[in-house]
Every structure is written in structure tokens, then in C-alpha cells.
Amino acid sequence: MPASEDRRGKWKRKKRGGLSAARKPKQEEEDMEEEDEENNNNNNEEMDDVENADELQQNGGATPDPGLGIGEVVEDSGSRISDFPAVVKRVVIRPHASVMAVVAAERAGLIGETRGQGSLPALENISFGQLQALSTVPADSLDLERSDGSSSAYVISPPPIMDGEGVVKRFGDLVHVLPMHSDWFAPNTVDRLERQVVPQFFSGKSPNHTPESYMEFRNAIVSKYVENPEKTLTISDCQGLVDGVDIEDFARVFRFLDHWGIINYCATAQSHPGPLRDVSDVREDTNGEVNVPSAALTSIDSLIKFDKPNCRHKGGEVYSSLPSLDGDSPDLDIRIREHLCDSHCNHCSRPLPTVYFQSQKKGDILLCCDCFHHGRFVVGHSCLDFVRVDPMKFYGDQDGDNWTDQETLLLLEAVELYNENWVQIADHVGSKSKAQCILHFLRLPVEDGLLDNVEVSGVTNTENPTNGYDHKGTDSNGDLPGYSEQGSDTEIKLPFVKSPNPVMALVAFLASAVGPRVAASCAHESLSVLSEDDRMKSEGMQGKEASLLDGENQQQDGAHKTSSQNGAEAQTPLPQDKVMAAFRAGLSAAATKAKLFADHEEREIQRLSANIVNHQLKRMELKLKQFAEIETLLMKECEQVEKTRQRFSAERARMLSARFGSPGGISPQTNNLQGMSLSTGGNNINSLMHQQHQQQQASATSQPSIIPGFSNNPQVQAQMHFMARQQQQQQQQQQQQQQAFSFGPRLPLNAIQTNAGSTASPNVMFGNNQLNNPAAAGAASINQPSFSHPMVRSSTGSGSGSGLGLN
């Protein structure tokens, strides 16, 4: 007892420490209160539980977690291990308390303990509505190997079982009846469910496991069953059917086909074992009592094995009326529909009406008109994936081109009754649509074409003794009899001679090939030739009738004879020679008219050509006139440019003379030298400047003797400034007068520069050497113009030999 109490105390301390780290403060208070109650009231029961837990631990068991209210804790991040179904692998940090309780109960059951199993929770798979398998996994579990070496286990949900006659399909030349929920099966394709059963055939990792090999042995199994659908097919019957296939893969595919009813659906003796169970639902306790667990665990077989659908028709009833199942029987599908009450809608499972809609993606998916118009489509389909199918024309007329006599009579009768109401006409016909009725009515021949084949009896051919021509009808080819022999003798070959009506054929051809006026001329001339005899006969008959007006009896007899003769003449056809004469007259008239039109068109062409030439000449004249105007404007521009050039040259010479005379008092001789140097361009300016400098020094020495104190006189300086300004004004007036006159012959540049150099030196009036040097002053007076201003006069003390030249 002391050892058990010590063990119990350790367990209590361990329990308190674990709960304090896992629960919240509120939960800790509740647990402490529960522990106090257990310590006071249930000490003996706790000791028994601890002893039982110790025994389980010694036998390899695990202590159950007493905290049944603790939820499952997993990591937030995980790795995706399957794309379909979407599976994410997460690490479980703490499993759910119910899971631990179930595991503890299973382990307790292994050692013979059954206490506490009645209160175990029932775990249900919410995804598929089945009991979750926890401990038992069969050897052939559906594992899909991943590229990274991992595997993902997933479960295929059972299909909803649909009762009915089944779906009839063609398996080659044989008939294959499938359940309603197995309508996805097709011999030439592989469905998603099949890829989940044997994924190794579609991974591409092994050369022996390919989709083609899977379809080969799958179709071999189905073909083996279809050969004798009344017999239940087993795996032993299919041994040696296909070589090179693993027995496990073969067995798995066989069980899959059997589960879905693709095989053994119409077999008479079906043996479908239920889900395998290792332990019976009824169990016996150690005390000898028998009990039934409330939530017995099931294996994973319950998720892939389900109740087998039952076919209402036996195999003998379906296939007994088909002695030879070959593709040559045209009414094979019709007889199958008669036995199986036609197909059913894949949405509402009702029998299909006469008109239904078929899927283009999968030809076995059918919809009735109500489901299609209300948008109740199969998953993965839309209205664009379905086409309208009419079984009335499925095996016969596809486009409605084949009409029977009865349908044609109904169409004509409906047209008479309902006029242009084609909806009622189509309803009256019954087997054709509105568009087909309209198309067939337009294709019907008119009455004239129908009357061509009618044979009229009692018509005799008469001969005309006057011209010896046999008046017979046309032959089958439309040729005129009697003309072939005559035409062979004639040398003239005329067109359309073999047509039934050569004249009208010629007129029609001319109307389509040439102008309408030419064709009208041809027709008019032909008719005039044909009606010439008629006019002559009518004039003769009018004369005879006038002579018979003498007696009443004779008049009545003549009128009677005239009417009889007119009737006889109206019935007699035209002679062949008259037809050919009209033919030739029409051709000649057409040729003449065409020649006149051709001449007129030629004259019109000549007139238009002359107009074109005249317009081209006028166009050239206008261009030449524009060129003359452009040349005149160009000459004016050239004159303006020449004036501008001369003005720039004068300005340049004046600027150069002003620059060289600016140091003070350059004589006119210096200006003349500068003008000569600029005009010739060959003299040296430096030598001239040196000579001028020497002359200035020589004049400076003789200046006081000539006009003493002149340079210091302010009155003389003022007069010299005024004279310089007046000289500039006169030069500007001369330049304006030269620009006003028209240009004459072009002057050389040296003459322009010489005149400018001799007259454009305003600083010559300020040179003291000219005032003191008579020779220099005389030379300057020769080149400079005279000034006639009244205020300008000679200074006092200056003689006539001063040389200023001022008046």
C-alpha cells in the first residue's frame, strides 16, 4: 500500500505539471477543483486506474491522455503532396484527444481488455460520407509515387448508384450495356478515375507501364466479358489473356471494372463479396457476455467497395434477340432501343424524346430538350458542347433531301391550304422542317416543265404540196427535221441552225453579246420578213371580203370560209425557207446596224483624241507662261542682288578709308593712295604709309611760316567741322541719286573704289598739314568737290595761294 500511495502521488504531481503548461488559467482552476473532488471521493478508483495503466505500459501499451477536450494542433506551413485530390502534409504537434482514446482502445483490445470501448467517439469522413479508416490499410492501397520520392494516399469515393435499364454502347462490333453511373467509360479513352487506380501507367517512369498497354489489357477484359455477358467473369478466366502485365495490376484493374459495373453487370449469377473484415461486429467479453460496439471501425475497403448495382434486364433478355452481332446489321441500334426502352437523359434520367441533344466532347452524354433549354448541363459542359440530334433522320436522310411522293403531295396540299405560312406547312408534312419544306418547294419544277413529257395522241403530220416540205415536229435533240439534208447542200454555215427556234436563239445571243439596239434591229428585221406574207394575205383577204359584200348569203359563206381558212393557216407551221430568210435578214440587219454604230464610235474616238491633243497643248502653254513669269521674277531678284552688292562694296571702301585716316589729319593724297591701293590690289600699303608719314613731317616743319597760330584758332576749327558734315550729306545724296537711276553697264571695282576714296574722307578737313601746306591743299582741292555754303569763307591772313578752295 505505501508503494501504491507513493506512485499515486507521483502521478498527481506529473498530472498537475503537464496541465499547468498546456491549459489556460481558467482551465487550470477547473482541473484543480476536479482533482480535489477526485482526491476526496474517488481515491480507490484512481488507484485502480493507475494500476491498470501500469499494467498496460508493461505489456507495451500507452497511457491514454485524460484531457479529452484538447483539440488537435498542427503547423501552419505544410507541403503539397497531391494535386488531385488536393492534399497538404502538415506536422501534427499534438493529436486530438479522441484519436488518442481510439488508439488506446485498440491497443487495449489487442491484450484482451474491452472496457471503455462503448464510449468511444464515432469518427466520420466529412469529405466522402464514409467511416474513417484508422488502423487497417490493405496491401493494395492507392499510392501515387511523386517525383521527389514521396507518396500520397488518397481514396476514390463510390459513385451514386442509379437504378435503371442501363446505358447501351458499342464496343467494336458488339453491344455493351453499362450502369447509369458508369456512363463515363469509353473504349478509346481513359477517364480520370482510371488514372487514379493505376497511376503508374501514366507517370511515364517505366517503359512497360504506358497508357496504351493499360488500354490494351483493359479492353481485353471487357471484350472477354462482352463475348458472354450472361456468365460472371472472374480473374481466373482472364489468365493468359494479355502477356507482360503484372498480376497485381491486372487484379486491381479487374476489381475496379467489377466495382463500377463495367463487367458482370448483366451476369445471371453475380457474386460480389462485401467488404473484408478482420473482426466481427459481434464481440464476446471475458465474462462471456456478447455485445455490439456502437462505432465499429471499418477498413479502407469501405471507401472503394460499394454495393453492386442491379440490372433490370438479364443478359439473356438483352442479347438473345441478337444472334449475329456484326456491323452489317443496319437496325442493330433500333432493336437495342426497343429492348432497353431507349436512352435516358444524363441529368434527369428520364427517357429521351424524339429530339435530344448530344455532347461533342463525349458522345455518350445525352440531354433532353427540357434540361438543355433550362441550362441543366453535365459537369464540364456548356451549351456550345451539345448538338441537336433527330433520330428520325439519324439512319436515313441527313439533310432532308430525300422526299417521297407522299411527302411531296402533302407539301403541295399544305401550300394550297396555308399559302405562305411555312410553320403550318411543316406541321402538315410532319417529317420535314420548315427550311426543308421551303427548299424542296423551290426545287420543284414548274408546270411547263411537267407538261413537256406529256404525250398528246391524235396529232398527225401534214404535208404542204405547194413547196414540197414535210412539216414535222422537232426531234429529240431539238433539230428541225428535213433541214439536215438541205443544210448539207448549202455552203453558208449559219449559227444556231440546230436549235428549235434559230431566230429567237440568235436574238437572245445578240442581246447578251452586243448592244440592245443591235439586237432590236435584228429582231425587227426578222419579224418583218416573217410577217411579209401575212400582210400580203391579209390584204388579199380584205379585197375578197369587199367583193363578197354584194349578197348576204355570199357574205355569210365568205365569212365562214375566211374564219376556217384563218384557223387552218394559224395551225400550219412556217416553212423552213422562210425561217432561214428571216434568219439571214436578222443577221444582215444586225451587221448593218453594228457597222453604223462602229463608224459612229470611230468618229467619236477621233473627236475625243483631238480634244485630248488640244487640252495637252493648252496645258503646255500654261506651263511655258508660268516659266516666263518665273524668269522675270528671277531677273528682278538678280538686279536687287546686284544693287545690294554694289552698296556693300561702297560701304566697305568707305569703312576702310575711315579706318586708315582716323589717327589724325590724313591728306587727300593719302586717300588717293589708299583708293589706288584698294583698286589695284598690287601696291604695298606699308610703303605708302611710310611716304605719307615723311610728307607729314615735312609739312609740319613749314606750317608756322605759312599760317601762324591757325591750329589754335577755334573759329577755323568750327568751320572745318561744319564743312566735313556738309561733305558727308552731299555724298549720301549722290548715292541715293545713283540708286534711283536704273543700272547701266557694270563698272569695274577699281573705279568705284577710286571715287569713293577721293570723296569719302571726312577727316581731311581736320589735317593741319593741309592748312599749312599749299601744295597739299591744292592737290586736295582738285579731288574734293567745291562747297557753296554761304557761311563758308576764307579766314583772315590767308592769301589766294592758300589752296583751300573754299568759296
From Swiss-Prot:
One of its GO terms (molecular function) is DNA binding. Residues 176-274 form the SWIRM domain. This is SWI/SNF complex subunit SWI3C. GO terms for biological process: chromatin remodeling. Disruption phenotype: Plants are viable but have alterations in leaf, root and flower development, and are early flowering. GO terms for cellular component: SWI/SNF complex. The keyword 4Fe-4S does not apply. Expressed in roots, stems, leaves, flowers and siliques. Residues 458-467, 552-569 have a biased composition (Polar residues). Residues 692-703, 726-739 have a biased composition (Low complexity). Residues 798-807 have a biased composition (Gly residues). SUPFAM superfamilies: Homeodomain-like (SSF46689). Zn(2+) binds at residues 345, 348, 368, 371. Component of a multiprotein complex equivalent of the SWI/SNF complex, an ATP-dependent chromatin-remodeling complex, which is required for the positive and negative regulation of gene expression of a large number of genes. It changes chromatin structure by altering DNA-histone contacts within a nucleosome, leading eventually to a change in nucleosome position, thus facilitating or repressing binding of gene-specific transcription factors. It holds the Pfam family Myb_DNA-binding. Residues 398-449 form the SANT domain. It is found in: Nucleus. Keywords: Activator, Chromatin regulator, Coiled coil, Developmental protein, DNA-binding, Metal-binding, Nucleus, Transcription, Transcription regulation, Zinc, Zinc-finger. It comes from Arabidopsis thaliana.
